[in-house]
Each structure stands twice: as structure tokens, then as C-alpha cells.
Amino acid sequence: VGSEMCIRDRYTQQDGAAPQKVQIEIIRDDRPDTARLTFTNGATSATVSPDGKQVAFIARGEVFVTSADYATTKQITHTPAGESGLSFAPDNRTLAYASERNGNWQLYLAKIVRKEDPNFPNATIVEEEALLPSATVERAFPQFSPDGKELAFIEDRTRLMVVNLDTKKVRQITDGSTWYSTSGGFDYAWSPDGKWFTLEFIGNRHDPYSDIGLVSAQGNSPIINLTNSGYMSGSPRFALDGNAILFKTERYGMRAHASWGSQDDAMLVFLNQDAYDKYCLSKEDYELRKELEAEQKKAQSKDTAKGKKGSKKDAGQEKAADDDKAQVKDITVELKNMEDRMVRLTPNSSDMGSVIISKDGETLYYFAAFEGGYDLWKMDLRKKDTRLLHKMD
């Protein structure tokens, strides 16, 4: 059996003298002290929770969630890998993101464990779950469905997929033949009723000029080309309670004929004639229509209440069910003459950033750069009045 001898100190000794301890010094290369870094900018992406009380963002490849009203912030991930793509579940207590661990992008869910914890910034325990782990398939850019029961994502950078979070069953929405770039994903969005996706895609193999499409969320359906443009269109999102799709396009501004220097405009394509007719009303006619609709809704509520009998508890349950049903109104899609229901919103083309329409459909907000950096602009869609809301640069 072998043995080991460990020597702690070294000594020298001459004849007739006492042992002398040898002083040993080891010189090592300098290394910096551990530093605590504080950042107030540099986030690469961010998203707001459905209740508007939390903001999730990514800084230096890590996921953080902060309170919208206070400085309380919690770091969700602690990994050497990069994270990207953030999506809150409708319950505000689950966060989806992608992480490039072990050299492969995969989906993860972070969940607040304790029911007593109101949000992520104040949560004491946050659990992380790997969703559909795989060593060969890449999955990224997650987005929760409006009801929170499903999660959409982009697989292998080209295919739009959906997973049922209860059964873990995955279905294919697009087959990857309409997107050629493998440098990242593409923009897409759920419809408010959860039955459709709008997305940017390459139609007629006209890469890299993308169009705006509409496709069923059930899968096994072709993409409907809404724009049919020879120029770049992108950043689609649903607006006006899902009755229209807002997007950016370079068809009116300077075009990227030499692969640079293009300018964008914000546009709306209306999915049905009623939504388009409402948009085209003057401010006076629109106010009259709103009053008429309010009176009709009030009368309908009275008739419904008269026709229902039962206890207060039953009535309350029925009212809650009716409210939920009203909030999830199915979107009417009318393909005929859709090309005539497309309008340019912005008065002039620009180097444009993010674009969004207010929930009531009255105001357009967008970032645009004319001279220098981006500024925040506001446009009244009824009055066609545009003004600078905030000077950023």
C-alpha cells in the first residue's frame, strides 16, 4: 500500500547547529480584485408585464425584473450563457426566455413559487424550468398565448411553432420555407383571440424583402400575404382589438436599393370592412358612433338582466362569464378587397424605431430620427396632427 508524505515547512541544518526555517515566497501574476458593477443603461431588450407593474429586461446576458414604480430589482438568471427573448404570462408570475447553454438555444420558464409573493422583484423563491430540452434543436423567441395556455417560439431560426404547456405537445405553424436567414428569428405576434399569428415572411422567394403575413394558429394552413410589396415590410403587431395589423414599410421612403439607407413609414391593414369604415370616420361622426354603441350596449345589458333569474351569486357568476366572453371576441377576417383597406399613418418617411397604437386606437406613438438620434413622436389619428412628445437626443 502506497503512502504520501506532505511537507508543510522546509528547514536547513548545519552540523552542530539548530535547524533554520527557510522563508519561501511565491510570486504570482497580478489579477484584478472582484468588482461589484452597477449599470443604469445598456439593456438589450425589455418587456412589460400584462398588469403594467413589472419590467423584465436583459443586461449583460442576464435576466432581471424590476418594479415599474420602485427601484426593487431581482436578478433571475446567474449563468455564463447569454439569455434573450422575454415574455410574461398573463398571470404576471411566469416569465419565458431563451438561453444559449451548452452551445444551444433552449427555452426556459421562471416561476414565482410562493403564492404570498406578489411579483418577481419581491419574490423569495423563483424556480427555473427547462422547456422541451434538446441538444440538437434550437428554440428561441418565446411568446405566451393570450390565455397563457400555450407558448409560441421559433425553432431552428426559421419555423414558427407552438407548444401546449400542459401536454407539452408541439405543433408546427410554418415549415421554414418562408424564411431564409439563419442569423436570428423573425417578428411575429399572437392575435388577441389567440387564433391567428401575424408575422414577417419572405413571399415568392424574394429574399431578403419581407412581407407581412397572417396565418392560423392551429397550423397546417398557408400564410396569407397581406402586403405583396416589393420592398421591406416588418415589425407586425395587432392593433384596434385585433381588427387591424400595424407594421413598418420602406415602400414610400428612400429604398434600400444598395442595401442601406432606407426609410420607413407606419401603416395599418384592416382585417375587416367595419374596422376600416370606423377608422375613416371624421372625429364628429366617430364620437356620435361611440355614443350610439354605448346606448345599444346599455340597453342590451338591461334586457339581459331582465331575462335572467336566480340568486345574486348566480347572477354574479354569469356576469363574470359574460365579461370574460366579451373580452375574448373573435376576430373577423375578410380577405376580399383587403388591399384597399391599407392606409399610411405617418405623414413622412424617417429612420423609424418602434411603433405602437394606443388601446383606444386614437394615438400613434413612434420613435423616429431625422437629425441626430431617435425622438418620441405622437400622432392623433383622427386629427392627423403630429407633434414631438419627447426629445431623446
For the regions a language model picked out, list residue spans one by one.
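Short, small-residue-biased leader/transition segments that mark boundaries at the very start
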Residues: V1-I7
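Conserved beta-propeller blade repeats
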Residues: S3, P32-Q54, T79-A98, W105, ...
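Structural motif
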Residues: R8-R10, F64, G103-A110, R159-V162, ...
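Multi-bladed beta-propeller domains
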Residues: Q13-N41, S67-S84, K111-A140, V163-F186, ...
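Long hydrophobic segments that form regular secondary structure
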Residues: S49-A56, G61-S67, S191, G213, ...
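Short, conserved, GDST-rich strand-edge loop motifs in beta-rich repeat architectures
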Residues: I112-N119, E200-D207, K248-D264, L271-D324
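Edge strands and adjacent loops of beta-rich recognition modules
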Residues: D322-D330, L335
